[in-house]
Amino acid sequence: MFYSHLLFFTFTFACSSSLNRKTKREMDLEDIILDTCHQKAVCAHIQMHLKETYVDELCKCGGGQECPLHWDPNDGHSITLAYNQWKFCSPTSQDLPVCTREQTAREFSYDMKPVSKKVQMFMFFNCLCPENHFYEFFNEREEETGGGQLAIIEERCEKMKQCEKTQICQKIETLQGKFLFKHVKCFCPGDQNCNDDLKKADAIDVGDDGSVQHYMKCH
């Protein structure tokens, strides 16, 4: 299936997504087409760790508009949940309904061109997951288009679990000392907090590309 070709890691967790796919930075940049955004599509995803941010641009705004690529929950172009912010070309409503358990909360579309092997990616919100929930993959469907193969990934809201005693609560990835990605796995019990200090990571792992995974536990 098309989805399996993009399988890599959990996109964003705890108020963002558990979609297993590659982001722009993990694919060869030459494989990605930043096409003009569809109406109501997310143009960028921003993650924040302490005061650092990482921006993943998904498409280009048309009609003379620009995608706001900086963290600002009050710009009228954003949906903000915890350390994640999604940007839109046009002013967006902050009053999206809260998702029900059975509702399709978010959709991703991937359009792979058979000749060029280029991929177009678009993200759409239908509703927002409640607090302490995340977006969980539940369905994939494929459609043949005149110019390639279209895969639609659908997600629902799932409640995040409380961390067990020795469980990793989050993973933070850096490259050359700069923040790239945060993946929250569970929430800490009681008065404990998930460590954010990279110098106090409970474990680290260095990837072949020089990226460093910092694994944190509750303290």
Curated annotation (Swiss-Prot):
It comes from the Eukaryota. Contains 8 disulfide bonds. GO terms for cellular component: extracellular region. One of its GO terms (molecular function) is potassium channel regulator activity. Transmembrane segments: none annotated. It is found in: Secreted. Residues 1-16 form the signal peptide. Expressed by the venom gland. Its main location: secreted. The keyword Disulfide bond applies. Keywords: Cleavage on pair of basic residues, Disulfide bond, Ion channel impairing toxin, Potassium channel impairing toxin, Secreted, Signal, Toxin, Voltage-gated potassium channel impairing toxin. Residues 17-25 form a propeptide. Voltage-gated potassium channel inhibitor. Belongs to the scoloptoxin-11 family. This is Kappa-scoloptoxin(11)-Ss1a.
